[in-house]
Amino acid sequence: MERILALDVGDKTVGLAISDELQIIVTTLNTIFRTSKLEDRDKLKEIIDQYGVKTLVVGLPKNMDGSLGPQAKKVKKYMDFMRKNIEGIEIVYVDERLTTVSATRVLIDTNVRRENRKKYVDSIAANYILRTYLDMQRGKNGE
């Protein structure tokens, strides 16, 4: 099996989380602070190469009715650029409704100061996204 990388793409940051090779354990990675698409691509490619990733699981922020809103369209456009500029990766989208809310709640519950939460919230959201994806895959395979 291979490691899978999850992304929580925002306007200013990209939260990251990665699975182990057995796709059981999910670990948060440092958040990428977005600068330009080319620099973001280089940072992302470095992580992909470092961990031997072939699949990116990307949170798609759907509206509560399941439709794609403006932010979801931005995410898809951003990831279309990455798909065209990073060879050999598969991109899978996962509904990420309320993951940032859940991640923020965890940080509040663990007494992380308000000014420090932004450093962690996107990567924790990516962790939720990847765990959701892995749970769905296990359900499909009857595990």
Give residue spans per PLM region:
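Phosphate- and other anionic-substrate recognition elements at nucleic-acid/protein interfaces
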Residues: 2-4, 12-143
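Conserved catalytic-loop position in the HRD/HxD motif
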Residues: 8
